[in-house]
Amino acid sequence: MHTSIYANRSTSFSPSAGNDTQNTFGRVSTGMISEVVYREDQPLMTQLLLLPLLQQLGQQSRWQLWLTPKQKLSREWVQSAGLPLAKVMQISQIAPCHTVDSMIRALRTGNYSVVIGWLSEELTEDEHFRLVEAAEEGNAIGLIMRPVNPDSLGRGHLSGLKIHSNLYH
């Protein structure tokens, strides 16, 4: 499993940041975007990584939004995973071409502690920038879930944990 976390990137150079200058310099945003590249044949690893975070976020008064392409969340799984059933919303059958825009709209609202979306392709720089901006604006976490084919793992370095953060660089 490979994760990339992009946190607290400054938006002070963006064209739309003019009105947010005070926020950019006056406080540290807690909004962030994280990408989890995982093997579908190893769901336990993904659950071990994400469930503690989702359980902690479930203690907030805000919702958790799951934008899933195919599968529907099982009520039994949500409850057995320790997630608050009353705070979990799901939109299933969402077309992959609409996932990023849907995540951006949801993150901006501030109604969700976390927005989880599945993508089959890597984000473009523009998509990533817009997601980070939206997460910071809504003080939320966006999780990009990207399944990888186990056969393609031999071609690149995707088996390690990689965390990008300005706290360490």
From Swiss-Prot:
Residues 106-112 are annotated as: FtsZ binding. Induction: By DNA damage, as part of the SOS response. Is rapidly cleaved and degraded by the Lon protease once DNA damage is repaired. GO terms for biological process: division septum assembly; DNA repair; negative regulation of cell division; SOS response. Residues 1-22 are annotated as: Disordered. SUPFAM superfamilies: P-loop containing nucleoside triphosphate hydrolases. It comes from the Bacteria. Residues 162-169 are annotated as: Lon protease binding. Keywords: Cell cycle, Cell division, DNA damage, Septation, SOS response. Disulfide bonds: none annotated. Pfam families: SulA (PF03846). The record marks 169 as: Essential for degradation by Lon protease. InterPro entries: Cell_div_suppressor_SulA (IPR004596), P-loop_NTPase (IPR027417), SulA_CellDiv_inhibitor (IPR050356), SulA_enterobact (IPR047696). Component of the SOS system and an inhibitor of cell division. Accumulation of SulA causes rapid cessation of cell division and the appearance of long, non-septate filaments. In the presence of GTP, binds a polymerization-competent form of FtsZ in a 1:1 ratio, thus inhibiting FtsZ polymerization and therefore preventing it from participating in the assembly of the Z ring. This mechanism prevents the premature segregation of damaged DNA to daughter cells during cell division. PANTHER family: BLR3025 PROTEIN-RELATED (PTHR35369), CELL DIVISION INHIBITOR SULA (PTHR35369:SF4). Belongs to the SulA family. Interacts with FtsZ. This is Cell division inhibitor SulA. It comes from Enterobacter sp. (strain 638).
